[in-house]
Amino acid sequence: MKQKKKKFIPIKVKNLIEWNEPNGEGCIVSDKITVEGYKVGYMVRENPMSEYPDSGWRFMAGNEDDKYMSDPNHHNIFALNTICNYDPDIIPYLHAKTGSAFIRIDSQNFEKDDESKPIFIEKQDR
């Protein structure tokens, strides 16, 4: 079965960040953000995969269920700077330690996720 080509939301990529961490600037991003147009609602920094240029960051809208997330066709690898262009609200949090997780609490702000609050889910204004 031939895989259907994804239609990523077109954006003009500007250099918004300088990333000099040793593991690289790759990140895994849900299609809810890059294809369906949601803002980042949940972000977690895992241990980077050492065999790849991986920052450890994983970005989701926050409305993905387990079935959606278990399908690798629903996420892609991007450069951090590219995802910052999709959602610049994430920039202040990018140097957080491995193990950090943040949820969106309103249109522009995140806070550390202690699993006590719902994720604020919103579409990008494009």
Give the predicted meaning of each segment.
Residues 40-45, 101-104:
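Broad, structure-driven detector of short, well-ordered beta-strand segments within folded domains
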Residues 19, 31-35, 48-51, 93, ...:
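A general structural signal for short secondary-structure junctions and capping/turn motifs
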Residues 1-38:
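N-terminal low-complexity, intrinsically disordered segments
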Residues 43-94:
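Acidic, aromatic-enriched beta-alpha/helix-loop junctions
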Residues 77-123:
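Short, compact, well-ordered microdomains
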